Amino acid sequence: MKNVTDSFLSLGHWPFAGSFGFFNTDILSTNLINLSVVLGVLIFFGKGVCASCLLSDLLDNRKQRILNTIRNSEELRGGAIEQLEKARTRLRKVEMEADQFRVNGYSEIEREKLNLINSIYKTLEQLENYKNETIQFEQQRTINQVRQRVFQQALQGALGTLNSCLNNELHLRTISANIGILGSIKEKTD
């Protein structure tokens, strides 16, 4: 026992370079006491756990974590593939709807274009009719104005001729002749 006590007392005299205080970390100068202390600590804290069992458990745990990670990755991959397929399906559907809208839009544009052309033709036809009616109205008005002027000029010319040709005597004779004609018409009707 004295040797053991001396060994512990002599630990204080060991150099600290490369040591932890109680243990000599230099593998070549490690003595039997250090090895026994290390083995005692391992046995005390290990309590029936063998190194191969501990290593096996560590490897099994690591294997389970890796398998779980792979399983989770596969599930995520499957979900991502499913979402991708749904997105592709929606994309195809939207593209088909866009094509239908495009075709319907072109058809609608063509219909609107034809409606606009027809409307313009109708408007032009109405304008042509209004123009023709206006021309006819103006022609008729001009003809009426010309007739009135011709009539007025003819009347003035006739009155001028009558006034220049008629004197009092001729005027009285014309009146007497007209009275005679009216009198004979009256006798025939009675």
From Swiss-Prot:
Its main location: plastid. HAMAP family: ATP_synth_b_bprime (MF_01398). It is found in: Plastid, Chloroplast thylakoid membrane. F(1)F(0) ATP synthase produces ATP from ADP in the presence of a proton or sodium gradient. F-type ATPases consist of two structural domains, F(1) containing the extramembraneous catalytic core and F(0) containing the membrane proton channel, linked together by a central stalk and a peripheral stalk. During catalysis, ATP synthesis in the catalytic domain of F(1) is coupled via a rotary mechanism of the central stalk subunits to proton translocation. Component of the F(0) channel, it forms part of the peripheral stalk, linking F(1) to F(0). This is ATP synthase subunit b, chloroplastic. F-type ATPases have 2 components, F(1) - the catalytic core - and F(0) - the membrane proton channel. F(1) has five subunits: alpha(3), beta(3), gamma(1), delta(1), epsilon(1). F(0) has four main subunits: a(1), b(1), b'(1) and c(10-14). The alpha and beta chains form an alternating ring which encloses part of the gamma chain. F(1) is attached to F(0) by a central stalk formed by the gamma and epsilon chains, while a peripheral stalk is formed by the delta, b and b' chains. InterPro entries: ATP_synth_b/b'su_bac/chlpt. GO terms for cellular component: chloroplast thylakoid membrane; proton-transporting ATP synthase complex. Belongs to the ATPase B chain family. Coiled coil: none annotated. It comes from Coffea arabica. Keywords: ATP synthesis, CF(0), Chloroplast, Hydrogen ion transport, Ion transport, Membrane, Plastid, Thylakoid, Transmembrane, Transmembrane helix, Transport. In plastids the F-type ATPase is also known as CF(1)CF(0). The chain crosses the membrane at residues 35-55. It comes from the Eukaryota. One of its GO terms (molecular function) is proton-transporting ATP synthase activity, rotational mechanism. It is a single-pass membrane protein.
